[in-house]
């Protein structure tokens, strides 16, 4: 039986009144589902404080790093079609040399990028490439590479991997990444979503969930009920002419690493597709072998083979957060010393991805054994306290378990 609970209150207008209130989400949404559909929905708070608009499970939000999982689904569709190869050297496809400067004879492959084992770091940047810029300028910078580890030998979570994946997808098809994802993933699954707003309808953008910093100030997607005038980083000449796009030159343009705008209900449809081995509502998006390829860990933590923490400025990534990782898919509840990757606290293995950016925390997790899953997000929780039993925050632990 589907149950819907909604709460919108003036409490959220006073976010910064005290430290205890500062940890209360401006908006939070949680959707539980199984293979057949949604079984429970909880929504509370405000999607837009200034407008007084209550949050709902149909409101699109910048879902942060869960975007990586969705990007990988699109990439796997191209692998199935023979347009991409998980283990081929990407340099010839990209049209520019992609090599670790300390290990120039080691090819960089799609598999290494999707599993954060290519030897790349975010030290040279990854998202602020202007409309007329080239992603190769980032990878040509020695700071973009981990000089201590050869590709394929070490896990180091890095956002920059995914703009490169998007560039490869564009070169393989000649299509712009955001439009390609509409064709490969969103349209077949009947999901109203987009990367960086450009390919979303105005009506969808009008329901955007605004993201708030610790002080309660809007920090992202505060577009007053409209699509933004420019959905990408402007060119060096400050224009927003998308006709300048060239396949593969700048895969960062539509933020494949974090810029997916999607509702909790839309993300639940993607979770159901994964639970059903690539099928949703009689539409086969992926073959079971592709779903297994995505979800099978390519890396499992040991003392000397990777970092269990994301190197970012959020302050919310803790040691033990990553312990198993596939092709843009994280596996939870690793029973190994040093691992604290179980926000549910029940020891059950789940797969999916977490997200954290601009005051938002999010998660998509499925339990394949029971055929169930959950999607959640919360905004305005930049200062969320540490969790009680995992490397996740207290907010994520509550949303994962469905407790208030």
Pin down the residues of each PLM region.
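Short, glycine/proline-biased beta-turn/loop segments that scaffold the active-site neighborhood
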Residues: 86-101, 187-189
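Active-site SXXK
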Residues: 30, 36, 60-90, 162-170, ...
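Bacterial N-terminal signal peptides that target proteins for export
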Residues: 1-8
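Short, surface-exposed beta-strand/loop micro-motifs that present aromatic residues
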Residues: 352, 360-370
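Sec/Tat signal peptide C-region and signal peptidase I cleavage site
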Residues: 18-22
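Bacterial N-terminal signal peptides
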Residues: 8-16
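Short, conserved catalytic-motif segment at the N-terminal edge
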Residues: 23-61, 83, 144
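Short, surface-exposed loop or secondary-structure junction motifs
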Residues: 48, 101-348
């Amino acid at each position: 039986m589907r149950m819907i609970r909604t709460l919108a209150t003036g409490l959220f207008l006073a976010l910064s009144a005290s430290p205890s209130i500062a940890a209360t989400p401006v908006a939070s949404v949680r959707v539980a589902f199984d293979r057949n559909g949604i079984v429970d929905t909880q929504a509370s708070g405000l999607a837009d404080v200034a407008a007084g608009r209550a949050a709902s499970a149909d409101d699109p939000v910048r879902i942060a790093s869960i975007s990586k999982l969705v990007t990988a689904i699109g990439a796997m569709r191209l692998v199935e079609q023979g347009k991409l190869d998980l283990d081929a050297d990407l340099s010839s496809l990209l049209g520019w040399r992609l090599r670790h400067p300390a290990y120039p004879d080691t090819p960089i492959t799609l598999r290494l990028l999707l599993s954060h084992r290519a030897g790349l770091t975010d030290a040279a940047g990854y998202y602020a490439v202007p409309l007329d810029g080239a992603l190769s300028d980032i990878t040509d910078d020695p700071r973009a590479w981990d000089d201590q580890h050869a590709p394929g030998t070490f896990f180091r979570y890095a956002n920059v991997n995914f703009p490169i994946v998007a560039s490869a997808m564009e070169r393989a098809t000649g299509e712009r990444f955001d439009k390609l994802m509409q064709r490969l993933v969103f349209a077949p699954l009947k999901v109203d979503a987009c990367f960086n707003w450009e390919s979303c309808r105005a009506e969808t953008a009008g329901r955007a969930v605004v993201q708030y910093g610790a002080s309660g100030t809007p920090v992202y997607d505060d577009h007053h009920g409209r699509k933004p005038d420019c959905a990408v980083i402007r060119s060096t000449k400050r224009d927003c002419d998308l006709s300048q796009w060239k396949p593969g030159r700048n895969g960062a343009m539509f933020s494949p690493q974090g810029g997916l705008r999607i509702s909790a209900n839309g993300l639940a449809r993607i979770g159901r597709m994964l639970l059903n081995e690539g099928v949703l509502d009689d539409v086969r998006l992926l073959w079971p072998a592709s779903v297994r390829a995505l979800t099978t860990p390519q890396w499992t933590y040991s003392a000397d083979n990777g970092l269990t923490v994301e190197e970012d400025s959020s302050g919310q990534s803790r040691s033990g957060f990553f312990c198993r990782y596939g092709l843009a898919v994280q596996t939870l509840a690793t029973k190994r010393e040093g691992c604290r990757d179980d926000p549910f606290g029940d020891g059950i293995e789940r797969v999916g991805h977490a997200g954290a950016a601009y005051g938002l925390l999010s998660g998509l997790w499925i339990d394949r054994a029971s055929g169930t899953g959950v999607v959640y997000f919360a905004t305005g929780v930049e200062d969320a306290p540490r969790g009680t039993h995992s490397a996740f925050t207290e907010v994520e632990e509550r949303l994962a378990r469905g407790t208030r």
